Amino acid sequence: MAETVSPLKHFVLAKKAITAIFGQLLEFVTEGSHFVEATYRNPELDRIATEDDLVEIQGYRNKLAVIGEVLSRRHMKVAFFGRTSSGKSSVINAMLWDKVLPSGIGHTTNCFLSVEGTDGDKAYLMTEGSDEKKSVKTVNQLAHALHMDKDLKAGCLVHVFWPKAKCALLRDDLVLVDSPGTDVTTELDIWIDKFCLDADVFVLVANSESTLMNTEKHFFHKVNERLSKPNIFILNNRWDASASEPEYMEDVRRQHMERCLHFLVEELKVVSPLEARNRIFFVSAKEVLNSRMNKAQGMPEGGGALAEGFQARLQEFQNFEQTFEECISQSAVKTKFEQHTIRAKQILDTVKNILDSVNVAAAEKRVYSMEEREDQIDRLDFIRNQMNLLTMDVKKKIKEVTEEVANKVSCAMTDEICRLSVLVDEFCSEFHPTPSVLKVYKSELNKHIEDGMGRNLADRCTSEVNASILQSQQEIIENLKPLLPAGIQNKLHTLIPCKKFDLSYDLNCHKLCSDFQEDIVFRFSLGWSSLVHRFLGSTNAQRVLLGLSEPIFQVPRSLASTPTAPSNPAAPDNAAQEELMITLITGLASLTSRTSMGIIVVGGVIWKTVGWKLISVTLSMYGALYLYERLTWTTRAKERAFKQQFVNYATEKLQMIVKFTSANCSHQVQQEMATTFARLCQQVDVTQKHLEEEIARLSKEIDQLEKIQNNSKLLRNKAVQLERELENFSKQFLHPSSGES
């Protein structure tokens, strides 16, 4: 015949299921705690997860770890109480099918004993407050050990660990607690607090040879005050004694039943009358123990002298065990796991709320960040497009301003060159025709002209140029302002100060007129050289004066040649006439210079022609004029001649650099405006860089927020799955009847 499954397995399965669920729950909350902590401590994600959320979920993680340890140690607990020598230890031994606890004459229990299974093959005991495992081989040795220990008092607990292989009942997480008699102590409250609050079932072992005593009732009244409707069984032990008086058996049984029912229903009010009848049993623990030990040894159950009605008492004991196992398994599952299940659901609800709040905050932040990123991208595109347009406009503006400056400087410099004589006349310094003095004089004159012209040009151009540059810079700044942040706009004038711009004209007169050669030697106005210069000009006069050493009347070959072909009869042109005149005068001058005789001959001819008086008057006037000019050729006159020569020379040289100087000034203006624009562009570049960095930061933040949303949803789905498992656990183990319906 196959053995039926013990109802105690219900608790074992429930414990295994709830332990697994709490293990998953702890793993889930730990994962959620790490997720919330990482989110909270991320400096880039502000206000997504709060410190309160982190503290709360970490607290749940710690609580679940403790609950997991408690669940692993949870077991069904039944406590046996009764008066001294009522047979409590015998009942436990009968249930264990072996003499585990000392019982019988002279072996009363003097302290609390808890019997639980061990996976080892050796029995041992541990006293309260000690971790020492004391080996126990026989029941007598256990009894001897308990009675020899003088430190054991009625309120002490001794753990007896019995091999599970020797006792099937201990394999299903069941702990049986034996107690001293309730009539040996007044410390009932301490007992209850210490040993009864976590008990799932209480068994009152009464002596059927007497009635329920007040000490027994008093104890359970106190238990009922501390616990809400405790599960209480009443065993009327030693019922085999009734076999000696069979005529009174039913009356005695009815009397005990009525008193026990009244105690459970009316006094304690823990069960209904119908349920109470299933909590009261009439047994003989000693008979059952002997019978089961015989059976374990292969002997007949009924061997030995047994009182009449043994089979009925054995069956009732078995009914008690069946009812007890069903009751304790259901009760233990409910008392040990129901509150933890409710607490787990509450934790899941709270964690789900935290995850939902994180998810919502991340979603809102993500939408805001995406909108902000789009705004930043649009602004970056706008700045880039505007910069392209503004760059072309600024280049055009710079070109217009530089051309305007070049024209102004060119006109002003031309006017100043025309007024150069006035500037030279204003120069006063010591003048002397010696080379050393002349060198100093020329150097100072060059400096005077350079300073004067520079000053005059600055007076005429600088203010207008500055106004034009300032206006252009202001226009550029105003056009670029909208592209910069408000904070930079307010500081723009400090970053790009509009300072006064001074043009550098750099005339460099010293080098420009370095090859000037003055001519301040006295020259008579009616002298031969002066006349030649006056009539022929400087270039032709030079040719004539240098040609004195050539042969007399040397004429160009073109005039001496005989034409072989017809020529035009027209008069010679001006160039030919000029060439002929030069040739004749050169020949004449050469003749007069070659011999003084020629002078005498010419003078004689003139003397004969006009007379000596006219010649004398002419020579006198000629000499007087020469003398006048010679006397008036002073240092002052030399200085005037020097200045006039310098003005003519400098005018020619300065006119050559008008275009260069105006171009130089326009280049300076171009550099100034380009530098200003470049500084502004630097600020715009910084702004663009900040925008690019902000866009990159927002993109990273959006990715992180999306990941947070996904993780929070994933964790929430895990929470929902755990809720389903808890619900299934409740239907299967806590409320099986409702689950079936």
Swiss-Prot record:
The gene is Mfn1. A helix bundle is formed by helices from the N-terminal and the C-terminal part of the protein. The GTPase domain cannot be expressed by itself, without the helix bundle. Rearrangement of the helix bundle and/or of the coiled coil domains may bring membranes from adjacent mitochondria into close contact, and thereby play a role in mitochondrial fusion. It is found in: Mitochondrion outer membrane. Residues 72-321 form the Dynamin-type G domain. Residues 9-73, 338-364, 703-734 are annotated as: Part of a helix bundle domain, formed by helices from N-terminal and C-terminal regions. One of its GO terms (cellular component) is mitochondrial outer membrane. This is Mitofusin-1. The keyword Signal does not apply. Residues 108-109 are annotated as: G2 motif. Keywords: Coiled coil, GTP-binding, Hydrolase, Membrane, Mitochondrion, Mitochondrion outer membrane, Nucleotide-binding, Transmembrane, Transmembrane helix, Ubl conjugation. InterPro entries: Dynamin_N (IPR045063), Fzo/mitofusin_HR2 (IPR006884), G_DYNAMIN_dom (IPR030381), Mitofusin_fam (IPR027094), P-loop_NTPase (IPR027417).
